[in-house]
Amino acid sequence: MESIGIVAPQTMHFAEPLRLQSGSVIGNYQLVVETYGELNAARSNAVLVCHALNASHHVAGVYADDPRSTGWWDNLVGPGKPLDTNRFFVIGVNNLGSCFGSTGPMSIDPSSGKPYGARFPVVTVEDWVHAQARVADAFGIERFAAVMGGSLGGMQALAWSLMYPERVAHCIDIASTPKLSAQNIAFNEVARSAILSDPDFHGGDYYAHGVKPKRGLRVARMIGHITYLSDDDMAEKFGRALRRADGALDAYNFSFDVEFEVESYLRYQGDKFADYFDANTYLLITRALDYFDPAKAFDGNLTAALAHTQAKYLIASFSTDWRFAPARSREIVKALLDNKRTVSYAEIDAPHGHDAFLLDDARYHNLLRAYYERIANEVGA
């Protein structure tokens, strides 16, 4: 299937202040978005795709000046693909606090004339959803045919169905969870500690020092990456294979340099991430993950939290995902069924762990293709 081809982001400016869940207010902010396909006359074929931790508005296609810049969900979104841009108008939004053009820690604070840095207010999933709703308003979209996301993006999709029930026809929540477990919060805390303890962090004002806390970011990414893969997947990819600088394949070097393939892989992923991502953004997004808990206001009762939803749901999980295990998706399914909502659920047998939601798995893609076919028939797309 063909790619959607060359795409270009656009920057949307919002003068109306946005009050955040923390009580802080952001005024005169911007959000970077990309769109694919055409919005129909009835404005009924719009799909919002919400991104996960290190992704962005760049969901599909490539940029003219970089043919390697393929969108993070390009295998899923495009002409003839499961989310078919010949039939749907797809929107990707870079969230507040990110480092890919939307207002965030790297942006200039108008009160000081310097980057916000650590002074950028803490944001939540709910704050992102409110900001995304303003994007929808700007496009004249009263109701999305679907809001979809994987992992943290799935949390946003679920939040949309809670916060704007009348504006979401279908919620597609993939490899997600109704709240983080203590173990997941612990992983985030260790990652944040690596960043905060980096001497180049400078209290979050490293921009003024001309440095980046790359050592901390590397470790944070390495920790995260371990949780995205399954044990079986790591065993198949790396096993205990050696990767020594001198090329030896059958002997230990008895040092603390890289000796195993898996070590080399993690260091490569950490180095790559530290080159393009912002440490303050990493702190913000992991804290947003920690705070997401729609049942908290209902004494932990998820069924009560979902009582006023109106959407139809597709919930999907992956058998080897231990970061957000299938049992967590089934919690959402049970709460929705308790509320007599229309729910489709699939647990896909895939060896790739949490990252499976990003990969081109035939069963997974066929599931989404069939579900979007149903939506297309509903909206006449």
Curated annotation (Swiss-Prot):
Question: Could you say which residues bind substrate here?
Answer: R221, D355
Name the Gene Ontology biological process terms.
Answer: homoserine metabolic process; methionine biosynthetic process
- Taxonomic source organism: Burkholderia ambifaria (strain MC40-6)
EC annotation from Swiss-Prot or TrEMBL: 2.3.1.46
Give the reactions, separated by semicolons, that this protein catalyses.
L-homoserine + succinyl-CoA = O-succinyl-L-homoserine + CoA
Compartments, as annotated in UniProt = Cytoplasm
Which intervals hold domain AB hydrolase-1? 45-360
UniProt KW keywords: Acyltransferase, Amino-acid biosynthesis, Cytoplasm, Methionine biosynthesis, Transferase
Top class in the EC scheme: transferase
Subunit structure, per the record?
A: Homodimer.
Q: Describe which pathway this protein belongs to, using the record's wording.
A: Amino-acid biosynthesis; L-methionine biosynthesis via de novo pathway; O-succinyl-L-homoserine from L-homoserine: step 1/1
Name a GO CC annotation attached to this entry.
Answer: cytoplasm
Point out the annotated site residues (description: Important for acyl-CoA specificity): R323
Instruction: Specify the domain of life of the species encoding this protein.
Output: Bacteria
The positions flagged as active site in the entry are S151 (nucleophile), D321, H354
Q: Pfam families in the record, alphabetically?
A: Abhydrolase_1
Single Gene Ontology MF annotation: homoserine O-acetyltransferase activity
Q: What does this protein do?
A: Transfers a succinyl group from succinyl-CoA to L-homoserine, forming succinyl-L-homoserine.
Q: What name is this protein filed under?
A: Homoserine O-succinyltransferase
